């Protein structure tokens, strides 16, 4: 996950996407592609903020989870490598969620939702991620009697804290995946609802005759 190319790939990718949005504006006269990009970047930035806050909490709970479990020995004394890892993971996960919502709202036979209607669904994904993190963190703590010895044998001094942090990370991913699936289903259902209530086109004069 610690990709040194990210520092130049992300800006270049951003410029390319903006250029595509401007070209689409010139060709169609609308900002539909730009609004879709707004959803993507909003999801990515939101996920990065969540990941940074989440990892700050789990790092405070168990530095060993990062220094041993994630293979970041410098994380034992510094949050910097943890923050870098969080931003990378958040960027990728956020783009994936945003892309799923944009595709679910892609034009077709169904009516399209305005992009602003997707914002609550992004919030729903975050809520599911938080719920998953809390639930799995509790399960991690409860698993100490079963897994604590094995974790300690790996050199971990505080197995319970390690398992709590590990559970929180697994739960965040599971919760976000479930939340994204629910949100995609909700977007599709909302589009069907709009389509069913869309007035049918009036028949032309030739059809009436």
Residue ranges of model-derived segments:
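Short, highly charged, low-complexity non-transmembrane loops/tails of multi-pass membrane proteins
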Residues: 192-209
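Perimembrane loop-to-helix junctions flanking transmembrane segments
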Residues: 64-79
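Short, membrane-exposed interhelical loops at transmembrane-helix boundaries
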Residues: 72-74, 147-165
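C-terminal TM-helix exit segments that contain a strictly Trp-centered aromatic cap at the helix terminus
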Residues: 49-61, 131-147
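Transmembrane alpha-helical segments in integral membrane proteins
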Residues: 17-25, 91-109, 172-196
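Hydrophobic alpha-helical transmembrane segments
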Residues: 8, 79-95, 157-181
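Alpha-helical transmembrane segments and their helix-start/interface "positive-inside/aromatic belt" motifs
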Residues: 26-46, 116-129, 181, 185-186
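Hydrophobic transmembrane alpha-helical segments in integral membrane proteins
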Residues: 1-17
């Amino acid at each position: 996950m610690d990709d040194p190319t990210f520092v130049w790939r992300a800006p270049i990718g951003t410029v390319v996407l903006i250029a595509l949005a401007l070209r689409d504006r010139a060709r169609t006269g609308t900002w539909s592609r730009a609004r879709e990009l707004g959803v993507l970047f909003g999801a990515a930035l939101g996920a990065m903020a969540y990941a940074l806050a989440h990892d700050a909490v789990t790092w405070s709970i168990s530095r060993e989870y990062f220094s041993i479990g994630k293979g970041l020995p410098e994380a034992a004394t510094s949050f910097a490598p943890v923050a870098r890892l969080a931003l990378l993971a958040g960027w990728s996960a956020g783009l994936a969620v945003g892309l799923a919502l944009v595709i679910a709202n892609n034009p077709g036979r169904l009516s399209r939702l305005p992009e602003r209607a997707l914002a609550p669904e992004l919030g729903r994904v975050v809520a599911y991620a938080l719920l998953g993190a809390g639930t799995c963190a509790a399960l991690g703590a409860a698993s100490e009697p079963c897994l604590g010895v094995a974790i300690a044998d790996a050199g971990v001094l505080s197995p319970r804290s390690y398992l709590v942090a590990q559970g929180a990370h697994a739960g965040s991913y599971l919760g976000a995946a479930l939340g994204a699936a629910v949100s995609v289903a909700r977007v599709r259902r909302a589009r069907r609802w709009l389509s069913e209530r869309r007035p049918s086109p009036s028949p032309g004069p030739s059809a009436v005759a």
